[in-house]
Amino acid sequence: MVLTKAEISDYLFHKLELSKQNIKDLVEIFFEEVRKSLELGESVKLSGFGNFYLRDKKQRPGRNPKTGEYIPISARRVVVFKPGQKLRSRVESFKDIKKEKDIV
């Protein structure tokens, strides 16, 4: 299953009883703020959920799998997500529940 912005908006629409346009704008503004912060090189910390931060990767050697030719992979900056403890705990407990159901 994939959770989309449209599904988030629909869920919030039913929970908050605001107009669909206001909810859509709210979701869009939230994600735009996350994007802007990361573009500026800032971390995004969402308490109880996790942190988004940037990691600089150095140039490294790579290989074209079709030709076998060695090519350099250029240095770049990537976005990394590190889940918070609460999120990790919930995911782990869900995994344990699913494992118990599979055993039965």
Curated annotation (Swiss-Prot):
**SMART domains (alphabetical):** BHL (SM00411)
* Xref: Pfam families: Bac_DNA_binding
Against SUPFAM superfamilies, the record matches this protein to: IHF-like DNA-binding proteins (SSF47729)
Q: Which GO terms describe its molecular function?
A: DNA binding; structural constituent of chromatin
Gene Ontology annotations for the cellular component aspect, listed alphabetically: cytosol
Transcription regulation as a keyword of this entry, yes or no, is: yes
- Complex and partners: Heterodimer of an alpha and a beta chain.
In Swiss-Prot or TrEMBL terms, this protein is called: Integration host factor subunit alpha
Q: Which gene encodes it?
A: ihfA
